[in-house]
């Protein structure tokens, strides 16, 4: 399951992220991929701040080389 936030304004992107995380939790997804793009890194920082404080996210990391690298964050969801 993945969410593409590229090109979105921060407020809209973070609203979509919250909804996405809720749906992923309800679906029992073990992990999620969030595509925020590389750009200036502002959206990446905001996404990771939300993930850091989300009760159902246990950890997150930059996507692998074949997943999009620094333009993607992969979050592990709690059981």
Task: Describe the residue ranges of each PLM region.
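Long, charged, low-complexity intrinsically disordered regions
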Residues: 1-79
